């Protein structure tokens, strides 16, 4: 007999809990001892979008086999099933004390005849984590005193019900909102308010007019979405880390640049003036220690330079660049981070204008490098490095003007043509350029191999 079959039942069930329920059921053919193990597996994870009747019969058999045994996690990912039977499945696991419930019930049309969530889902004193996808409506009373994590994806909501829901979750620590649609077809003023929330992830909320945050102990924010008309309130005093990725269309970028250059047509002013309100969002996160900005976000911030807050606690700043997005806001960002220690640049190539600022060497200026000389950054990381002459010149510019720089780390972009060259040649060229910067340690990672230049 093999060693695996000799393991205790408890350990075998723990191993099976890492498989989907269908995969776990298939192990019953291994031996008689394995035949009924599925009845004792504490996690049920069911995914099926094919033969609907057979699928529903399978779920019925699994739950019947498990009887009243305790259950920790129930995940259901399916489409086109009988809503009454789904309600029975949910009721079954809730009676058995499920603490994590994930439901993704998809129908053929978007939010047409979607599965209406079993109302008792929101009356459970043991539920700790709840994930809902493709659910069209949340209704009924709410009693989830232990819920810590709520994940909403492709869900159709009422703003009023959503705000009531948040206030009814006293233990909520993590909220994830992906592709949220609102039942209100007119102007939507959304307030994310929670006294207990620590982690918030927002990806693409549709048709929102204003967005406010009242989250006094929030520690982590990941926000990706189109710029709303106004960020009316942003109470995030205890925020530690933020990732901001604003979405814009190409026409908006053209209008932003025209406004900066005083070339914007009067009819287009309204379309971009809302971008100036992004400063309110930035002001709300001013106490952070770690900040990540996308290329679009950096470009939009060019309209907020005069109102940019001082990030007095910021230690690590990560900025992703794109060749078609500008660095106009880079100088003010560096000047407004008086205690910055680590700067991470994901790419160096960017859209060059005469207002690109003094942070790079793209345009000859009298105040070249001024924003760098006042920046206390000690570690500079360059990711996606391609080994071009333009990049190497820019890095040399950083080495010359960052007065406190102690360490430079460069990561060659994977699968980049530059890697086809002899690494020693690339390294030799770079070290020759940077040999005068003797006060800084330089590291270059090429194809998994690390090259170093250490100071004495």
UniProtKB/Swiss-Prot annotation:
Gene3D superfamilies: 1.20.1280.50, Ribonuclease Inhibitor. Residues 1-54 form the F-box domain. InterPro entries: F-box-like_dom_sf, F-box_AtFBL13-like, F-box_dom, FBD, FBL60-like, LRR_dom_sf, LRR_FXL15/At3g58940/PEG3-like. It holds the Pfam family LRR_At5g56370. PROSITE patterns: FBOX (PS50181). This is Putative F-box protein At5g38390. It comes from Arabidopsis thaliana.
